[in-house]
């Protein structure tokens, strides 16, 4: 089991998803310090307070401070690893991407693994290239953005751009804005 201790409830889903991507066979339990309960009144019942936390061989502590986030990782039989990085909490998307990027690099360092989709978890991976292409970005600009922001592999970036282009071709023939959409999830 992997335990995660947070002092705020922000980005819990993203943290959980990224840890599960690196450790698919492990249960991941999220715990909160008392400060998180005081700040966030709507904490889900399935989450636990740090007081009830059981001793785990693998543990992460993520602390949100004024203008930075600190991550400490202790995996069984390994020396602890940590990183601290500056963030601007006013920009939620930028903060989330910085958190996921730094957590990813820390996980990559301690596990020796990398993920083909990088930090992209739980989303339709063609949504981002499709949006960027619709904004007039070139395929090269889209690829650079996905590599820099989401740390995706070249193979997966090329695949997502190719599928986004096919999707754009199909959608250009339909009046999808006044109709219905059906999404069928097919794993890549």
Language-model features, listed with the residues they occupy:
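Cysteine-centered iron-sulfur cluster-binding motifs in ferredoxin-type domains/subunits
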Residues: 185-188
């Amino acid at each position: 089991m992997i335990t995660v201790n947070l002092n705020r409830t922000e980005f819990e889903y993203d943290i959980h998803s990224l840890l599960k991507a690196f450790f698919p066979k492990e249960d991941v339990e999220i715990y909160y310090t008392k400060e998180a309960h005081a700040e966030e009144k709507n904490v889900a019942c399935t989450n636990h307070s740090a007081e009830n936390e059981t001793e785990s061989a693998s543990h992460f502590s993520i602390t949100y401070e004024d203008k930075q986030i600190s991550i400490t990782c202790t995996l069984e039989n390994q020396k602890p690893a940590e990183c601290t990085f500056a963030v601007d909490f006013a920009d939620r998307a930028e903060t989330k991407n910085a958190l996921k990027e730094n957590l990813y690099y820390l996980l990559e360092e301690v596990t020796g693994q990398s993920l083909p989709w990088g930090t992209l978890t739980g989303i339709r991976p063609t949504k981002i290239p499709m949006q960027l292409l619709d904004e007039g970005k070139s395929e090269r600009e889209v690829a650079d953005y996905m590599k820099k922001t989401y740390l995706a592999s070249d193979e997966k970036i090329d695949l997502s751009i190719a599928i986004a282009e096919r999707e754009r071709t199909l959608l250009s023939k339909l009046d999808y804005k006044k109709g219905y959409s059906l999404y069928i999830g097919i794993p890549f």
